[in-house]
């Protein structure tokens, strides 16, 4: 019985984050997974999808007033993306930790401000909105 209680407690203490591998970078999927794994993150869900323009608008609605918004949305629809839900137990600020990993990957593999390998949610509210674009049951 102790094992069941421990498993329930551990599952309740898991933080989840949403990450999207942008068009043109699907070849880095394993690299991204391995980098997250180095810090104790595991993939709980993943999917690939070619976004519709309306979905890209949903994904980046916080940037709708920015000059780059139209180009960013068009770029995100240009080819297949791969989305991930990563999870990790017992972490205080998952979005801060993931931002550090994201910036490291962008620095190493990014080609420009827009073609910067991946996007990650910066809050629970953003994650709920963004993950729903890729995962039906979110």
Q: Where in the sequence are the language-model features?
A:
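Non-catalytic terminal and connector segments of soluble metabolic enzymes
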Residues: 1-138
């Amino acid at each position: 019985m102790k094992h069941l209680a421990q498993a329930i407690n551990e599952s309740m203490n898991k933080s989840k984050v949403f990450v999207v591998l942008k068009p043109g970078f699907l070849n880095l999927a394993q690299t991204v997974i391995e980098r997250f794994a180095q810090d104790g993150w595991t993939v709980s869900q993943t999917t690939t999808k070619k976004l519709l323009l309306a979905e890209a608008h949903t994904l980046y609605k916080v940037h709708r007033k920015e000059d780059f918004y139209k180009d960013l949305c068009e770029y995100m629809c240009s080819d297949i993306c791969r989305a991930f839900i990563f999870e990790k137990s017992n972490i205080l600020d998952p979005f801060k930790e993931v931002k550090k990993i994201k910036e490291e990957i962008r620095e190493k593999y990014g080609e420009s401000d827009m073609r910067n390998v991946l996007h990650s949610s910066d809050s629970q509210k953003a994650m709920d909105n963004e993950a729903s674009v890729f995962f039906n049951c979110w």
